[in-house]
């Protein structure tokens, strides 16, 4: 009888031991995946970003200064260039991972086996985003620019804007003295010295041009075109860093939303990153839109700019811009913002 009781006690203890082991094992198994996922998500995404000194640089500095990059565990290093085209050149030369530029500047670096890819819209000018200022009293209408000297940012969307201006108003480009510059400061210096008769000036420098005697003939409505800007990376980089690029898009979306909601407030956040008055930054932010998306309209504009530029020999290669669009990371995080159909 005693042996029987001992056996029962032993059996109960064995069952309890097995139950505890089973529960502990299940608990460890259940916790394994979340722990691994958390660890993966917390691995920092390191990226070298080339930004321009104007409109497109703003969301990156908002994301950095407001801690949005930190929120998504992104460790970003920055290189600042004069224009968007310079940032795209940096990506082409493997001096940066990401660049950003307006439509013409970006497509001018495609074709000929280029590995560059459009990932998302990032920023664009509204029709009020730039004005055509003249500094010669004899210029009363756009057609009067024939025979005058104008400031041109070679290789940037500004070159395309001038080409559109000349075509739409029947001005022979050969009749205009085009003063090529490599920085905004050079353009302002030409205006100040009196060497320039006209300049397309964006909102961040328009007040300075007006102080120097500039008189506006009108904004982008003169040519019915406002530039759109895009994020550009190499395809090989995108294929290796899909999850990190997804996080980057989320961070930039958050930064863009903050800018759109409060241009004045975000101007205060980034004023130390730029050598222009905070009110100029706020005006530039107000005259721009920020978003992470790729709409049919965005791609249609890229396509239109490309075809016109090839036809008018601003771009030497013939290619289809739609071959340079990479949607995977954007579709993963913001599928509803992709309305472009191949």
Where are these regions (language model features)?
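Ligand-binding clefts/hinges and TM-proximal coupling segments of bilobed small-molecule sensing domains
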Residues: 32, 155-176, 250-282, 321-325, ...
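Conserved C-terminal helix/tail region of periplasmic/extracytoplasmic solute-binding proteins
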Residues: 310-342
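Short, low-complexity disordered leader/linker segments with a strong preference
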Residues: 1-46, 336-342
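Soluble non-cytosolic domains of exported or imported proteins
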Residues: 54, 82-85, 152, 156, ...
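Pocket-lining segment of extracytoplasmic ligand-binding domains
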Residues: 178-179, 185-272
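Secondary-structure end/capping motifs
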Residues: 240-316
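Extracytoplasmic/secreted envelope proteins and their assembly/folding machinery
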Residues: 57-61, 88, 92, 103-106, ...
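Short, glycine-/small- and polar/acidic-enriched structural segments
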Residues: 33-172, 178-182, 197-203, 216-219, ...
């Amino acid at each position: 009888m005693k042996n029987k009781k001992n056996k029962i006690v032993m059996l109960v203890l064995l069952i309890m031991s097995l139950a505890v082991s089973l529960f502990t094992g299940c608990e460890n198994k259940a916790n394994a995946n979340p722990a691994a996922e958390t660890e993966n998500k917390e691995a920092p995404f390191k990226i070298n970003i080339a930004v321009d000194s104007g409109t497109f640089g703003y969301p990156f500095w908002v994301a950095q200064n407001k801690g949005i990059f930190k929120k998504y565990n992104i460790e970003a290093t920055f290189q600042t260039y004069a224009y968007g085209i310079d940032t795209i050149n940096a990506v082409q030369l493997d001096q940066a991972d990401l660049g950003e530029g307006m439509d013409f500047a970006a497509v001018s670096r495609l074709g000929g086996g280029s590995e560059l890819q459009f990932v998302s819209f990032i920023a664009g000018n509204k029709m009020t985003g730039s004005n055509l200022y003249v500094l010669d009293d004899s210029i009363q209408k756009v057609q009067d620019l024939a025979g005058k000297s104008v400031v041109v940012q070679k290789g940037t969307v500004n070159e395309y804007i001038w080409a559109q201006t000349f075509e739409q108003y029947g001005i022979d480009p050969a009749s205009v003295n085009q003063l090529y510059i490599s920085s905004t400061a050079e353009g302002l210096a030409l205006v100040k010295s009196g060497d320039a008769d006209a300049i397309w000036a964006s909102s961040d420098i328009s007040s300075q041009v007006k102080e120097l005697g500039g008189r506006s003939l009108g904004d982008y409505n003169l040519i019915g075109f406002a530039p759109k800007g895009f994020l550009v990376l190499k395809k090989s980089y995108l294929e290796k860093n899909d999850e990190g690029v997804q996080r980057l898009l989320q961070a930039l979306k958050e930064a863009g939303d903050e800018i759109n909601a409060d241009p004045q407030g975000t101007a205060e956040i980034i004023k130390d990153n730029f050598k222009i008055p905070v009110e100029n930054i706020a005006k530039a932010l107000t005259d721009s839109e920020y978003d992470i998306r790729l709409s049919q309209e965005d791609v249609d504009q890229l396509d239109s700019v490309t075809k016109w530029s090839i036809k008018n020999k601003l771009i030497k290669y013939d290619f289809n811009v739609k071959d340079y669009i990479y949607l995977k990371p954007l579709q993963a995080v913001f599928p509803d913002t992709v309305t472009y159909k191949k």
